[in-house]
Amino acid sequence: MSSIGTRTKPRMATAIPASITIPNRVDTRLGPLRFFDGFPDEETVRRLYDNLDFQRAVQAFLTAMPAASLAAMREGLQSIGVSNTTVAIFETLMDSRSLFLTANTESIYTVGWLDLREGPLVVETPPNVLGLIDDCWGHHVCDIGNAGPDAGEGGKFLVLPPAYRDEVPAGYHVFRSNTYGNWLLIRGFMVDGDPAPAVRRIKATLRIYPVAHTGRPPHTHFVNASGRSFNTIHPTDATFFETVNRVVQEEPAIAIDAETLGLLASLGIEKGQPFAPDARMTQILQHAAAVGHATARAMSYQSRIREQYLFDDRHYITRFVGGSHEFLRDGVRLLDPRTGMFFCATGNSPAMSARLPASVGSQYATAYMDHKGCAFDGGRTYRLHLPPNIPARDFWSIVVYDTQTRSMLTTDQQFPSISSHRPGLAINRDTSVDVYFGPKPLRGKKSNWIQTIPGKHWFFMLRLYGPLESWFDKTWQPEDVEELPEVEPVEPEAATLPRMSTLAPSAVVIADRIETPIGTLRFSDGLPDEGTVEKVYDNLDFQRGVQSVLTTMPAAAMHAVREGIRSFGPANETVVIFENLLDSKSLFLTPNTESVYALAWIDLRNGPVVIESPPDTLGVVDDFWFRYVADVGNAGPDRGQGGKYLFLPPYYAGVPDGYLVLYARTFNLGFMTRGFLVNGDPTPAVENIKQHLRIYPLSKADNPPVLTFANGSGRSFNTIHSSDFTFFAEVNEVVQEEPGDAIDPETLGLLATIGIEKGKPFAPDERMKNILSEAAYVANATARAITYRTRMKEAYFSPDSAWKKVFVGGNHEFLRNGARMLDARTLFHFYATGITPAMAVKMPAGVGSQYALAFVDAQGQPLDGGKHYRLHLPPNIPAKDFWSVVLYDNQTRSELQTDQQFPSISSQKAGLVVNPDQSVDIYFGPKAPRGAARNWIQTCSGKGWNVILRLYGPLQSWFDQTWRPGEIEQVG
């Protein structure tokens, strides 16, 4: 790289905030990251991409767990013969030989798998059962039975497949699923401890058949699953991703949100595409599965979520936080509770999460630790005291589970449980109950004893069926479990294989020691030690910080634009117009130097705002999350004739006549329009905009206030978001100012995990601030790698060229097959400003504009301001109107500051030298080549740069690639 020691200050240089640049070296947990003036070196790029893939895979493991869990359920059921016409029923209850997440031992489980690929299915349900249907992604479809629309009377349910459009017959409870595969769960109830009556009733009345066979429905078969050893628990190794891929391939894209599909697509899991990770990616997925698995265990067994703890001074937790089966609170997805739920349980229903009236439904409390905060040890003996008047109208139960598999603990007892139905249960005189856990029963306590196994950790769940008010008002609370120190522990060596033991697949358990990119992780029979918990939570916070930056960069970018505009004057009253064009003194993401820009900030908090658009301009309005709202001008509904646009704020009711009406999802909007030069002169465009552009509140339409036009040309101001910790403060302002539903729950949930949540102060402690500061730099570095050294093959115009696109995928929402193209979004918003379909879609030849970017020379090396280069544009440059070449600073992505006012050349430039064959050679370097000054753009020694070639009115030879720009060649 060139030396910066001899560089003098360019004439156009302005003060650049350090917060928008990145140092030449940043020390991080990934190792030292090195840059040449904002351009990452090869080793840095490798580290950043390895980290990006690893962290995305960890995030995918935690996010896609419901899909993997339901896929494992399907495979387990199909292994014992379950199909559309055959269901499994546990006639003598479910015992510990079946690997099933935290099932109870008091219900008659009937489970099936509904395949809707051939059309709708009818499910005729028995009376007095409690059931549900969930889709392949763990989303609730409907409740059945006592909590369903049949209210426990039995009924006919019609389940429709995705996109079903045929006539729906009458006489059914109709529900639509977003997936073809659906899990059916029905639970019957014992009568005086006997399951037989419920089994007979279910077998006599449960029917599943295609709606097309309503006249003569086929017989429904039943497989007795009691005592059967089969697995329904998802894998936790790299095969997890293969499992999720099968779900993605089989199900429609509408089944899950675009962000989740985009996350999976970034790992190679994309609908219609083969999942074939190479050796590097396979190793990354293996490490990510291990860390994701470890993180899920930390979330489940040592939760940081205070609301999960049912009582202030005890160790009981609830799986559902916020009272929502969708894990939503004020529009925010609760990410950790969702992971904890699907890691330890199956079945998602509002009846499980909502606060039902007293004595209705059931309530759950799970404990992983004794009163000292120590994990339960299968070789030790414990006592649980349930105080008098246990608040269960129907009955209560306690079931013990294995910390490795989260299924019932396998012991010599068929059922590792106790309930109030248990014959011989000892009840104290005051109606309290003492329950004992240990490898051997205490003398006289066997009736109240649940066996544990030395060398095995365990946890238990207390269930209250028909919970009473004293549970909800917390006047009744179970005691914490206490170890009985007087009882001698039993060592694992003395233990024998339990009578009910079953082989757990290695893919569902975790080793005692794992080497990972975040260090050595240690476990004791599935329980992470303190050091491991600290490591996975630090990594989780760090990766969420990085992902938050990459995901919310559009919002931070708009925030910076607002601050820049407001430095000239208030919103709704001020237009920044570049009367002498936009030069390099203004810090603005990749503007051109051939248009008259006019910018304004629109604030809808006090009501609708009108924009009267000038004729013959090209404008766009984007919201505060940088999403497209409207085209204004030539690409808008006024077709360049000028028009009155009315922008309505969120929740606004009533639409007045006489306007082109647009609905906004945010109160803050950014408006940008461009006028066009006439024979190289900006004056006509400036006069046109000043004469016709009006912005005013609808309430003042009868007497609009005067609009202030501020000349931005030659002014030094910043519209570029921060790259350090202050990035998070910028995004927090957006979250606080805008409605809670302005952005999707997943994004809000991601931000909430790092402390950014509407209505709450963003006040990270010292630990979190340090993590986020590092995450901000790593995210900024990652955005630079994605932009300057992109891996997206479709970003390049051809495999042998450095020229690439700013919009990848041809969609302004960065969508492909329902999946968000995460890297494409990052590339655009790190590098450019202004979202509109007009920039992304292919227009007819001769219409609109096209862009080509280059960040490296013909040898793949970063463009160095101390060296000399040449760009050859072959004959017949395909631009009906004109073309231009503009240089930008790698640090700021704004115009390169040199001695030249405009770091650009265009076909409109007076004196441009055109070769005899109509080709053009353009030169770049710190000094003009002899005889080529008219075709020279200056660069600065020690500064990196990049270039955009713009074609206005692009012709067909551009689209069919019979014309291509030359590569940038180093000369001299």
What does each of the following model-derived ranges do?
Residues S2-G972:
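A compositional/structural signature for long, glycine/proline-rich flexible linkers
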